[in-house]
Design a protein with these regions (language model features):
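Basic- and aromatic-enriched surface patches that contact anionic nucleotides/nucleic acids
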Residues: 1-211
Length: 211
């Protein structure tokens, strides 16, 4: 099996266009939004996130994808043996695709903190995907000030210092507009730092994977 060097954006596109398929034996998508948040935090910091194991070729025994896919093109598919959770998460966030998990189809909405600390802050809470967004909102807002990524909540989504990650990757929101919304100007040390951070965030698309 030959080695392929791909990027996070390549994997997301391959998942969305149907050229990466799941063998029937693979379990479905099970990651919570909090797991996706942790993946993107690792990508942002350049941490290792593993390899993607595939088998080149077609199979009639494939599982339905957790995201919407067209009919795969003949002769252009890979069977995804290991890495399904990561690849589906990449497609969901980088392309803004909805995912089917726990019998529900919904987007995975992450927010990026323009004012995050440079150091990693130890986790002292976890978002519960099954709770209503308004529940414990005050506690979450206070606890997330030191975080880089969080699962979106209603109150944080209304704060311009927290940027919707999928909107940034799908170009629904430009970095300069996001910074202007947050600081009212592009001409300040805070604005310069925020622009640098958003460019670093967008560089996740070029994160290298071995497949």
């Amino acid at each position: 099996m030959r080695r392929l060097d791909v990027t996070a954006a390549d994997l997301a596109r391959m998942k969305a266009n149907g050229s990466l398929e799941l063998p029937e034996m693979q379990r479905g998508y099970v990651w919570t939004a909090s797991r996706v948040r942790d993946l993107f935090d690792s990508l942002y910091r350049g941490y290792p996130t593993g390899v993607i194991l595939v088998w080149e070729g077609e199979s009639s025994h494939v599982r339905r994808s957790a995201i919407q896919q067209p009919v795969p093109r003949p002769g252009a598919s890979y069977l995804l043996l290991d890495g399904q959770q990561r690849v589906t998460s990449l497609a969901a966030v980088l392309l803004g695709e909805k995912v089917r998990v726990r019998n529900r189809t919904r987007p995975i909405e992450l927010l990026f903190n323009l004012e995050h600390p440079e150091e990693v802050v130890a986790e002292d809470f976890d978002e519960d995907d099954d709770k209503e967004p308004e529940e414990e909102e005050d506690r979450l807002v206070a606890a997330t000030r030191g975080k880089t990524f969080v699962v979106a909540t209603t109150r944080l989504a209304d704060d311009p210092r927290w940027v919707n990650v999928s909107k940034l990757f799908t170009d629904a929101l430009r970095p300069r507009d996001a910074v202007r919304n947050a600081y009212g100007t592009l001409d300040s040390p805070e604005a310069d730092r925020a622009l640098d951070r958003l460019e670093k965030l967008r560089a996740i698309r070029d994160y290298p994977y071995i497949m």
